[in-house]
Amino acid sequence: MMLVKKAGITMMVHAENADMIAVLQKYYLDRGKTDPVYHYYSRPPVAEDEATSRAIYLAKMADCPLFVVHVSTKRAMEAIRDAHIAGQVVFGETCTHYLTLTTDCLAKPGFEGAKYVCSPPLCSQLH
């Protein structure tokens, strides 16, 4: 991020904790849990929340402008908002499917559920 700041550009990140996801993916795969809904279970909202907060802290340390893409959770959005209000140059964007669809779509039978696999995954309405 320091090099990005030095170059005068904005860092763009897709924020998900890859280590957390790798552990959960292995856990579900080892148990034969491969239905589309397990894409959500292996990438829980906390994976995005933690990675978004970490990116914000690192950007603050580097004094680097930050743009978080594909924001899908309330906590990630709140972290971006709070940092922005505090004066940090940080922005986020989301996609229509995160505002209109939920994990219920992933639970559809057969290939139908696979049509809704995206990353970060669709969340429940609570997130």
Task: Give the predicted meaning of each segment.
Residues 1-127:
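Histidine/acidic residue-rich metal-binding segments in metalloenzymes
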